[in-house]
Structure formats: structure tokens, C-alpha cells
Amino acid sequence: LDKEIIIDRVADILKDTPSAEQIVKKGDNRHKRFRILARYMVEKAIEKDALILESDGLGIAILFETFPNEKENFWKESKENLNLLFNVTGFKNALKILKNQKYIQQQRPKEGAYLYCWFWGIVQNSRGTDSKVGRYMKDRFLKIAERDKLPLYAETQTKKNVIVYRRYGFELFHTWKRDDGNTMWFLRYIPKSLGGIGDPNL
């Protein structure tokens, strides 16, 4: 599937995602800002071999294998972050985003490798509780967690997503009532090999 098509689809999904809606600066050319953010996410996913696609590209996930003490290339990260600051978030949002990210990262493991679901979305006309695309995507990344014997972490600001995650064997381990009035739920999937209940349907 062409990378530009994937970027377009991720950009459209991000518009329906509360966390992305909050960080992308409002005003003219907002669609362009969402697309810049989508390009950054997709290219980072490809670089890290973390992009998961449903066969028709209707479902897209980004699943990183993460190490708590892993260091990124400072200059490369700085250039990318400045690009996001100028073209996506704007300066007003920057401090709040950094504060929120620090809190989110504090909820993740302090040692040992783990999987982190940075993004999981389905194009609009393929969504729904009975979506084959959703089940396919879920099976893909839970099988990776089981295969690699690594816990899988995710967070969401959408209550109905919490219900779906829990149906798939995730446990809700933390709830954050944010200063802006929004709520964020933190979830993790512990593979059966690590003593978790796993997904009963897997």
C-alpha cells in the first residue's frame, strides 16, 4: 500500500482522536497540520518496523517495542520536535503537551522491555463492534505480545475504547482525571506466558 495513502488515512483517523485533536493547533490549514503529524507518525513507525496494516490498509496500528532506558538520536529528535512545534502544535500547546507526556510515561514500566500501542485506528466506514478489520488488528498485535512474551501498554481518552480493550483481555490499571477536565484511561495486556489472562478469544 502506498505510503501517502497510509498517511492520508492516519490523518483522517487523527481528526477523530481526542489526544490528537487537543495537540494540533487550531486555525487555518488544520488539515495540513494533521497530515504533517500523520507523516511524522508513519515515518517513525516504518523506521522502527512498528507499522501494522490490515490487508487492505483499512486498519492501521503503530506498535513499538520499547526499552525504558533507550536513547534516541538527540539531533534527529530535536529537528523532528521543532518541526512539530512550528507546524503542528504551536508554542502555546507545547508546555502542556510536555507535561502530559511526562505523566503518561511515568505510568509505563521502569525496567524491562514492553510493547506500546502508540496508535490504533480504523478508517471511518470500516468501524463498528462487529468490524472484521478491528478483530484482525486486535489479533495481530495481541499475537505479537504473546509471541514475544512482552506486556502491551496503551492509553485512551475514549470510554467506549476502554470497554473494547477490556473485552480483549486488557486490564485497566490507572485512571487520570486531567486538569483540563478530560479523563485518560491506562490499560495493559499481560500475555498468558507472563501470568496474565490473555485474550479469551485468541
Annotate each predicted stretch with a short phrase:
Residues A113-Y116, I144-Q157:
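Conserved GNAT acetyl-CoA-binding A-motif
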Residues G128-K143:
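Conserved acetyl-CoA-binding loop-helix of GNAT-fold acetyltransferases
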